[in-house]
UniProtKB/Swiss-Prot annotation:
This is ATP synthase subunit delta. GO terms for molecular function: proton-transporting ATP synthase activity, rotational mechanism. Keywords: ATP synthesis, Cell membrane, CF(1), Hydrogen ion transport, Ion transport, Membrane, Transport. It comes from Amoebophilus asiaticus (strain 5a2). It is a peripheral membrane protein. Belongs to the ATPase delta chain family. F(1)F(0) ATP synthase produces ATP from ADP in the presence of a proton or sodium gradient. F-type ATPases consist of two structural domains, F(1) containing the extramembraneous catalytic core and F(0) containing the membrane proton channel, linked together by a central stalk and a peripheral stalk. During catalysis, ATP synthesis in the catalytic domain of F(1) is coupled via a rotary mechanism of the central stalk subunits to proton translocation. InterPro entries: ATP_synth_OSCP/delta_N_sf, ATPase_OSCP/d_CS, ATPase_OSCP/dsu. Pfam families: OSCP (PF00213). The gene is atpH. NCBIfam families: ATP_synt_delta.
Length: 184
């Protein structure tokens, strides 16, 4: 029977989350996951090495050990060793992403994004987080901000399957459409 990498990653992530909760180190493991994503983003060759079947598992483990062992919690490092032993280092990025999703669900955290024509001040970030909380019940909101001059002003807030489009570009488009329909 074929099991996809996503299903396997989900099992590892779920086990990591449960073990971290049981050991009382969930926040440490969460920080480790964020650190791993940061390293992976700045060193894209790391992912290519992990996915490369030609590179020996011992070499992959040595690389992971040199980068992470002194910087992450022993539970997280144990996962890296386990994956190397089982020759599954290539799914580590998927495990990390899945772990973060499960962590956010466990903590009641929702991800939202806001698009404006400028960088947001701290006050505006708080405002948009509160606005997102009013749209979807949650304990906390992680807000990603995007700058896009094409919206011409206003904002577009997205959380889960909801979008609050209060951009000038959309309002102008609606007005244009309304006046093109209304013939004199």
């Amino acid at each position: 029977m074929y099991t996809s990498n996503i299903q396997v990653a989900s099992r590892y992530a779920k086990s990591l989350l449960k073990q971290a909760i049981d050991m009382g180190v969930l926040d440490h493991v969460y920080k480790d996951a964020l650190f791993f994503k940061k390293v992976g983003k700045s060193h894209k060759t790391l992912f290519r090495v992990l996915h490369n079947p030609i590179i020996k598992n011992e070499t992959k483990l040595a690389i992971l050990t040199s980068i992470f062992q002194s910087r992450i919690h022993p539970l997280t490092f144990h996962l890296l060793k386990l994956l190397s032993h089982r020759k599954r280092e290539g799914i580590l990025p998927t495990i990390i992403d899945t772990f973060l999703e499960q962590y956010y669900i466990y903590r009641g955290i929702k991800a939202a994004s806001v698009t404006t024509t400028f960088r947001l001040s701290d006050d505006l970030i708080r405002y948009f987080k509160n606005l997102a909380k009013s749209l979807v019940p949650c304990k906390e909101v992680i807000l990603k901000e995007y700058v896009n001059p094409s919206i011409q002003g206003g904002f577009v807030l997205r959380i889960e399957d909801q979008q609050l489009d209060n951009s000038l570009a959309t309002r102008l488009h609606k007005l244009k459409k309304q006046y093109s329909i209304a013939e004199y």
